[in-house]
């Protein structure tokens, strides 16, 4: 997904411009730190105190120049209007968050308001149109059948959470003046690969290239476990 995000940024903003980035639900800060290393000014918003602690510890190991470009705040994505003025950011990330938000539309509208005109909204969501794929490919055919009629699933933490449909999000983004500009599939072939699986460098590069190509290509991207959507503020 980092390749796709970098591609969207490079295609939308002048080379060398220091962007104002808001990472909502930043988790351990992986994307926030990566973008700060690339020269951008990054604000991370995280509601989980433990994840925020881990992100702060990771930030503390970075060189001073990078630390100065990162601000970490405890808070929820629904609270962006409390912390920031409208139009404060060029890029807003919301990756792996919407599945935990029962009614995501108001939050998405708030995120769109944070963008300056022409700004980029990057979402990573679970693909509700492909929930049958994981259980079906692991032989749990009963669960696969049930998934066709559901927009919820049980995640790796054992929590029942939401998934989103592409068409519904397309309509939502249009309605909040950040229409869909591009979308990709994530984890087309690797959704059942165990977290932490280590591969030789050459094999890892092949996997990343395969996933990147599949995530841009129909019909593969439509059955990906996750969707990466990029909206642009009008």
Residue ranges and their predicted role:
Residues 1-17:
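Conserved alpha-helix/loop element of class I SAM-dependent methyltransferases that forms part
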Residues 105-120:
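A short glycine-rich, Lys/Arg-flanked "PGG" loop and its adjoining helix->strand segment in the class I
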Residues 17-25, 120-149:
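Conserved class I S-adenosyl-L-methionine
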């Amino acid at each position: 997904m980092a390749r796709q995000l970098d591609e969207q940024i490079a295609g939308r903003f002048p080379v060398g411009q220091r962007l104002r980035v808001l990472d909502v639900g930043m988790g351990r800060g992986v994307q926030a730190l990566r973008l700060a290393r690339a020269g951008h000014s990054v604000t991370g918003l995280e509601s989980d105190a433990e994840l925020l602690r881990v992100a702060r510890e990771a930030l503390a190991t970075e060189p001073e120049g990078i630390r100065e470009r990162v601000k970490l705040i405890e808070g929820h994505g629904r609270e962006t209007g409390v912390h920031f003025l409208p139009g404060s950011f060029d890029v807003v990330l919301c990756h792996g968050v919407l599945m935990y938000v029962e009614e995501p539309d108001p939050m998405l509208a708030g995120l769109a308001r944070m963008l300056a005109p022409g700004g980029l909204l990057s979402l990573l969501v679970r693909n509700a149109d492909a929930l049958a794929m994981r259980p079906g490919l692991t032989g749990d055919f009963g669960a696969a059948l049930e998934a066709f009629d559901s927009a919820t699933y049980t995640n790796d933490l054992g929590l029942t959470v939401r998934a989103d449909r592409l068409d519904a999000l397309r309509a939502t983004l249009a309605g909040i003046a950040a229409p869909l500009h591009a979308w990709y599939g994530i984890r087309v072939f690797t959704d059942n690969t165990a977290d932490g699986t280590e591969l030789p460098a050459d094999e890892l590069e092949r996997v990343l290239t395969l996933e990147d190509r599949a995530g841009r290509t129909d019909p593969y991207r439509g059955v990906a476990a996750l969707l990466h959507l990029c909206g642009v503020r009008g």
